[in-house]
């Protein structure tokens, strides 16, 4: 067979391909598979990228400042000195504020270059395996007071969705006002609306429903706005908490100022105590100067240094963001230490992995990667800048032998003394080619189309570009069938391979095996009585007979040929070291059908069985097995008849559905058209008012107009109608009588309370004055004895009344 030269690009080689397998043919006769070496493939090297992500927190801070001294707490003579000190503090605060404000403005403009990413664009970007969070923040200070109590923390767990349920009075689906269709008066209303071109109750109800739908939408938007307001409140609370935390960073500076102020107050008290002594006053002034120099000046210096650090940090972020937007990694954002940490991680942990075997870094110097462009991606959220760098890893080339896979059917009784025909087996779904390294640690499969796409033979090697996939590592839990057969792993073959069975044998054939110059011979179903071996150069036995064998390997002497009914082997002239005139010799090598053996051998014994185990000129003992028979039932005609029947039923059903849908659509269109028609053309189309009335009653009751009118003016209907009218008219009278009854009852209760209060007043006067008072209950009159004037409190109004009395 001609050797095809082959080159292929393989990615992610997991093993060293320095040693090349020199086997020309790998025989697995027990499975009917042969691997014929056709070429050597080479992966031309390649580059992969290792990604690493940093999450950089955008620095936030407050501008540091020093508080002024309260000069009112000092002696009046020290006020000029205190004012001078405050002027110095104000000057330092102003200078620090201006420099930091300008730096923050420059940084904000640089951040605007990187637009904020949407949340859905950043899914899992903070959860990657290589994510490293680097916090770059500046010291913070300030004199801001806390605006929230300690327990007034924002509730981060309150994620209850807003109540967007529409109230019942806005729900258009809860309109149950259709009961009014039962009121007889509605008939007259419909009659007049149809005749005099007026909107009917149905039209008004539709308008009400539309208004309810509009109200529901407005209500929903209102609730959504309320929910948005709650969310803004939560954001403000969170911001307030953050500002309180920043405030704590300036407490040290505030305490220093407080100490200075306390020292000055102490000095003032001491100065006042010895005010009478001028020399002592001068000493105290010098002490004040020393305290200002030793306490205030260092605080001002520290404030300026802190402001300068914040300004430097803002400038570093500004330059870093500009470089980032230009496509380069900036050392101001990703420092050399951070870059060195990633490089060390790749060298120690990534490259030793089998997936990255034989891959190397382009450079271990961090400065090399700061010069590379377009090797990163970035995004920005509200408080973070996310930077991902793709570090390239390159790999040198390696070589592996490439084998063409031949699969052929083999008899169940192959290599045994059983000559009965029990069928044939064949391995299914094998690829066209497989490349395996010398240590069988890595392999790759390819198709005939990929093999034919290769071109450009150079020293026995062809280039295939990207026609072949990435090599696969050897794994006992995940293996292809072709590789399992190649390494002759019996357990893996039973797990990953599919064996096909057929009771029809192949045609006789023969193929030379390049590994040992032997021939693989199959007699086929039509077995000859014998095969002829012809050795014309032999003077001892030029012609001999050989008993055929069903799939065996046969070695034939040099200069001899083999003839059969289905094939013929030409004389062998290669690899002959001895004279061609010697005694011809034929050797048969037998193998067993491993698919049949695995059915009768335990798993423990199966590990000791190899597909290439063979006997020379000796058959194996037969295996007791019955011929496999498969029974199938011919129900094709019945299934076809059912299919036709179901197909016809489906067509009928589809036509009926289409017809019903058309009728329904026409009815809906007709009803909608009538509902929208309020013009006097309705009467014109009917021809007369009588026809319009008839059409109205027909639409409402579904009957003839005269039958409906006769039913309305029948004695039964008129009697029922009169009863309903009487009940309606009786309701106001009942309501009036009920109101009168409640009014009289209320007046009677008022009169009883008045008489009771008068009795109590009379008893009090008896106890007070010893007078005899006589009442006449029916007329509320009294006979007065021995008393001229008396005072009574009105129980209703509460006013005092003077009453004259006689004996």
Curated annotation (Swiss-Prot):
Record localization: Host membrane
Composition skew (Polar residues), residue ranges: 133-142
Region annotation (Disordered) ranges: 133-171
Topology feature Cytoplasmic, residues: 726-807
Keywords of this entry: Glycoprotein, Host membrane, Membrane, Signal, Transmembrane, Transmembrane helix
Transmembrane segments: 705-725
Membrane side Extracellular: residue ranges: 19-704
Glycosylation sites: 277, 660
Superkingdom to which the source organism belongs: Viruses
Cellular-component GO terms for this entry: host cell membrane; membrane
Signal peptide boundaries: 1-18
Membrane topology category: Single-pass type I membrane protein
Entry protein name: Uncharacterized protein ORF54
Biological source species: Ostreid herpesvirus 1 (isolate France)
